[in-house]
């Protein structure tokens, strides 16, 4: 009786394994059979990966990775993490991963040497304020009263002129370094950046600054879009795209974004 029970369990496990190996679009297309190898940075940073521990599934990219893997038929235990530098992964040639997630913007130049999935994130515009304006509420009414700066050649200017409509003239600068310096020197109160850049500037570059709010991505002109990076010609691409498309269609992708890039960062949508 016991032998028959054990045999039944083993048979069930074997059937499940075979079903996974041969019945899914990822079958035979990964570096290691029945495993999905995903690369992240060394280290990986908040809020994309929490505490430099992608295996926890915490952080926006870590959470997206596990949700996508599940859609592709891989349980969490079959997701393998490796580390790469940002630049080495963009180089042409064979890769030691199936997918790489390090906030890679999809660009025509990069697509010459690597493949990208459909976008899993479109970076919205966010408001970065200097230390003198950190108590500003994330509302359109309050944003109008700030002194704004922007790089003259960017879409931030039209966003400010047509959407925010500040009460004082927008100060124009040659590049982002000049805008950053102006915020640091309290020459301006605020500037617009894509959310990843704004979070980085606040955490690392501009002491006392704060990201007080973000616009929805669909309200941004030509937003920066992140894709999962793959070796050029990777046969897994269609399967990855199917999984990401389903996550987007069901609202799961938006829910992950809200959890990790709005709630966790404390950067609410501007009203």
Model-derived features: positions:
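Ligand-binding clefts/hinges and TM-proximal coupling segments of bilobed small-molecule sensing domains
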Residues: 22-23, 155-171, 210-211, 242-271
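Extracytoplasmic small-molecule ligand-binding "clamshell" domains
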Residues: 23-103, 112
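Bilobed "Venus flytrap"/periplasmic-binding protein-like clamshell domains
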Residues: 38, 43-44, 55-71, 105, ...
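Periplasmic-binding protein-like
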Residues: 42, 122-129, 195, 203-245, ...
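Extended ligand-binding regions for polar small-molecule ligands
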Residues: 62-71, 133, 146-147, 152-154, ...
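Alpha-to-beta junction loops
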Residues: 74-76, 94-102, 146-147, 184-197, ...
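Short helix-initiation/N-cap motifs at beta->coil->alpha
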Residues: 79-91, 135-136, 171-185
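A ligand-binding cleft/hinge motif common to bilobed small-molecule-binding domains
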Residues: 87-88, 104-113, 159-162, 189-222
């Amino acid at each position: 009786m016991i032998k028959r029970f054990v045999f039944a369990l083993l048979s069930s496990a074997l059937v499940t394994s075979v079903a996974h190996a041969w019945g899914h679009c990822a079958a035979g297309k990964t570096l290691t059979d029945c495993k999905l190898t995903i690369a992240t940075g060394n280290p990986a940073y908040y809020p994309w990966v929490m505490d430099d521990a992608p295996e926890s599934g915490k952080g926006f990219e870590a959470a997206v990775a596990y949700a996508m893997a599940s859609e592709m038929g891989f349980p969490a235990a079959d997701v393998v993490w490796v580390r790469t530098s940002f630049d080495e992964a963009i180089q042409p040639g064979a890769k030691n991963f199936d997918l790489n997630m390090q906030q890679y913007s999809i660009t025509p130049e990069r697509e010459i040497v690597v493949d990208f999935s459909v976008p899993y994130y479109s970076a919205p515009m966010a408001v970065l304020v200097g230390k003198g304006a950190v108590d500003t509420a994330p509302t359109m009414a309050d944003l109008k009263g700030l002194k704004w700066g922007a790089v003259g050649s960017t879409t931030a200017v039209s966003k400010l002129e047509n959407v925010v409509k500040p009460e004082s003239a927008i100060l124009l600068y040659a590049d982002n370094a000049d805008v950053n310096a102006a915020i640091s020197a309290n020459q301006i109160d605020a500037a617009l950046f894509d959310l990843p850049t704004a979070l980085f500037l606040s955490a690392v570059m501009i002491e006392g600054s704060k990201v007080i709010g973000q616009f929805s991505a669909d309200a941004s002109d030509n937003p920066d879009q992140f894709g999962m990076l793959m070796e050029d010609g990777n046969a897994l691409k269609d399967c990855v795209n199917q999984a990401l498309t389903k996550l987007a269609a069901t609202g799961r992708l938006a829910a992950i974004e809200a959890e990790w890039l709005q709630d966790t960062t404390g950067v609410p949508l501007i009203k």
